[in-house]
Amino acid sequence: MKNDLRYCKILNTNINVTNMKKTVDYLTDHLEELRGDYICVSNVHTTMMSFRNKDYNRVQNSCAMALPDGKPLSIVCKARGFYDADRVPGPDLMPEMFKISKEKGYRHYFYGSSQETLKKLREELNRNYPWLNIAGMYSPPYRALTQAEEERIIREINDSKPDFIWVALGAPKQEEWMYRHRFQVRGVMIGVGAAFDFCAGTVRRAPAWMQELCLEWLYRLMQDPQRLFSRYFSTNISFLFKVAKENHEYKRENKDKKIAMIGHKRIPSREGGVEIVVDEISTRLTERGYHVDAYNRSGYHVSGKEFDEKRGKIYNGIRLITIPTFKSSSLNAIVYALLATIRVLFGQYGIIHYHAEGSCVMLGIPKFFGKHVVATIHGLDWQRAKWGNFASRVLKYGEKQAAKKADAIIVLSRNVQEYFKDQYNRETIFIPNGIDKPCLKENREILKCFGLRKNDYILFLARLVPEKGAHYLIEAYRQLKTEKKLVIAGGDSHASEYMERIYQSVKENNNIIMTGFVQGRILEELYSNAYVFVQPSDIEGMAMTLLEAMSYGNCCLVSNIPENIEVVEDKAMSFQKGDVADLKEKLQYLLENESVVRNYKEKSSAFICGKYNWEDVVDRTVQAYFGNAGEGK
């Protein structure tokens, strides 16, 4: 279970990289596994105690979770590349769990503080959370308890059948008590310090602005200067000095773990396969402790302005850096690649990872400055029909730059691997894309929006550009004898003339449905309910839509280009690339033979999810970064 959690080690103490929502979700999802274990809510004071005391360090690092209560801890985590790190204060976690208890029916036990505080706490809880199941409360004496008293208290706690045991004894006493009694209690123990007093109203908490400015300690100091002055002065000064020293060492030791991604349009996005790949790999790299900066491109969203959403600076632990570009489609890609490349020179990256041939035009610049550069060739882009002569030559130049100067080249298909060997005598690393097994969705939204029922339609899903072959499918569909509909799902990609030609060719046929760009629930439903998925491309790198269609258990009909056949093997039907008559014949056969379609559907999902998975992709990508992936494999 601990493998699901991310940590940042601060002064030899593991601090969770999390936020309030993730913490609440984790507690509810893993409650049964957490029973008997304990959670520390850490701040600067407990972290310094852990640094100075080996026994207390063992207590801190043995817990199931160590939540960053103090703002300074989340700041340190962010400074070390854990960009999604945030605070999870104990006094805020308690109310969040109380709210969710209305639905979940959780039982809560409160151990610690004074009898007077517990009495007021009960009154406040009954007033603010009348649904809350208070399993019990106990204020232990200030003296050390005998073994018999300890056993009696644990027995009473267990008899009350709590889900959560909130412990407020103050540090280090509460952590040591939880450590001593772990796996003896039936609930999960959470040490929350002064949270009982804050919730009961017996002690005022620092205002939010002081918490944001890391001045909560100052507010507490003003409340009790005689007791806290020497502690805070010693602790805070020591923490700042030692963390600064540790940060310097951390940056030096973890330089190779900082990665820049260049070449996609933006993440999160489904504008193309490159965006999906960068998203999947980057997310998993951050989960493994790598620090990833994704250089997004501003400007026109190929699928429509309504999908050009504003994103924050952090997404799934990835730092998003947006590079401004011109609106002109002919200039924005090259300007983006140049500006992103200049920006990464100042980023102290261990790896600069270029995606697609276009961005590789600038690959020589970081190489000149001694940077470690990796290129992923998603396909031979210069061959695509949508590009004019000049654009094709620029893309070809990017390909040559990658072949000549990249420290490692990743390719998605054996066909492209052979091309690089034949054309440039350059060894490459074959790492195909991955896929996760999805959950099938009923046809709720597509029925409402498009009138589509299960097995009622043939599905095409890709950008509407010439090389994706939608025109072949439309022409073949017109010749079919069928009542099934044809769904053309996808946005354009700077191919407005082709897009217009497609719309003109289908406007008289009510059985051909143009959905435009789709994502989310509608996309999932289209995959889940199709009769046949058709992929008629002339050119591909490794089509993510084909992997996705098979993962949903679809019967697939694909053009017989090597990149498609390599993926599907004998688990899909193929037709001669660009041959409308052959495509029509194969489609008619599948329409008339439901048992054949059913047979393909039964095999496709298990086959594709077993053959390709993202964790394997990331394993091999990391190996490629550091030079031990094995060339040509």
Mark where each language-model region is.
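Membrane-proximal helix-turn-helix segments that form the acceptor-binding/catalytic region
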Residues: 55-63, 96-103, 342-345, 392-409, ...
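Glycosyltransferase donor-sugar binding loop
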Residues: 114-115, 141-142, 299-300, 435, ...
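Nucleotide-activated donor-binding/catalytic signature segment of Leloir-type glycosyltransferases, i.e.
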Residues: 133-136, 499-521
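Aromatic "clamp/platform" in nucleotide-sugar-dependent glycosyltransferases that forms part
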Residues: 170, 538
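A conserved mid-protein helix/loop that constitutes part of the nucleotide-sugar donor-binding site
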Residues: 276, 456, 460, 465-479
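Short alpha-helical donor nucleotide-sugar binding micro-motif in glycosyltransferases
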Residues: 517-518, 525-530
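Short hydrophobic beta-strand element within catalytic cores of glycosyltransferases
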Residues: 555-558
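Conserved acidic donor-binding segment of nucleotide-sugar-dependent glycosyltransferases
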Residues: 573-581, 589-595
